[in-house]
């Protein structure tokens, strides 16, 4: 690695703390962080005070434990690429929610997880949705299955590495790869929710002409059968896939350009 021409030790310590909390995924005490980074508790404490004041880390129910807040996520969403995705997706999400009487969500990959970056509530009194910033393993969601299935081979290999580092079992990763072939053939994923009984998750890939690693996001519907539902579960996947294709077209993507 090329040595940086300038050093900013305080900034480096702050970034190390953020990366540590993101990598460990479970709340950590100041002593835990100091031990992980090989630094003294006092220097970590000073940095944590600043990060907590700025809203980048927060206390859990256990006041001794710290975790990342959604602040980094919120800052990241201000960047132009993500705003372009939002601008293209939100009108289609709103229209799809009204047509299907279902909640709609938009998810992207984050290491070995998916993160929900946008959502539209169901116009119906009954629906299912998760909060913005919600994270879940790639292997435990339709969004994750879609994003894995429609990634390039190189990017899929990277996702598998991240899953292995996160403790995923080889048999589970083999099952994920087998399911990916079926999803690629269908053009969408449709599976019972692994979070809530009675919900069927339907997801379809969104592509961006400026992104080369495959699907940039998953348009996902946690489908709930209600008396007011305007679309049957059998017809829903086609509508979700069509909406995802329109969003992709808005982002300048066409199937011809797919590598």
Give the ranges of each region predicted by the language model:
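N-terminal helix-turn-helix
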Residues: 1-86, 245-253
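Generic alpha-helical structural signal
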Residues: 12-15, 90, 94, 174-177, ...
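Amphipathic alpha-helical regulatory segments at dimerization interfaces
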Residues: 36, 88-99, 105, 179-182, ...
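A structural signal for short hydrophobic beta-strand segments in well-ordered beta-sheet cores
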Residues: 57-59, 106-107, 206
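Amphipathic alpha-helical effector-binding/dimerization core
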Residues: 62-162
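Extended hydrophobic
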Residues: 169-246
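Signal-transducing coiled-coil/dimerization helices and immediately adjacent hinge/linker segments
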Residues: 256-259
């Amino acid at each position: 690695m090329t040595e940086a021409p300038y050093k900013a030790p305080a900034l480096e310590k702050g970034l190390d703390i953020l990366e540590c909390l993101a990598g460990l995924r479970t709340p950590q005490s100041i002593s835990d962080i100091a031990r992980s980074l090989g630094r003294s508790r006092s220097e970590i404490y000073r940095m944590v005070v600043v990060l907590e004041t700025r809203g980048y880390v927060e206390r859990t129910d256990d006041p001794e434990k710290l975790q990342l807040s959604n602040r980094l996520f919120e800052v990241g969403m201000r960047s132009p690429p993500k705003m372009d995705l939002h601008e293209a997706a939100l009108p289609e999400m709103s229209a799809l929610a009204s047509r299907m009487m279902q909640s709609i969500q938009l998810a992207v990959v984050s290491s070995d997880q998916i993160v929900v970056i946008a959502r539209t509530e169901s116009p119906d009194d009954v629906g299912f949705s998760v909060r913005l910033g919600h994270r879940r393993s790639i292997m435990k969601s339709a969004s994750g299955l879609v994003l894995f299935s429609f990634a390039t081979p190189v990017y899929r290999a990277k996702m598998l590495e991240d899953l292995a580092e996160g403790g995923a079992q080889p048999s589970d990763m083999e099952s994920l790869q087998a399911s990916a072939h079926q999803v690629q053939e269908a053009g969408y994923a449709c599976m019972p929710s692994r979070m809530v009984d009675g919900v069927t998750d339907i997801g379809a890939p969104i592509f961006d002409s400026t992104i080369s690693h495959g699907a940039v996001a998953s348009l996902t519907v946690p489908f709930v059968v209600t008396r007011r539902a305007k679309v049957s579960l059998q017809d829903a996947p086609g509508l979700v896939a069509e909406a995802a294709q329109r969003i992709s077209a808005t982002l300048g993507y066409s199937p011809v350009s797919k590598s």
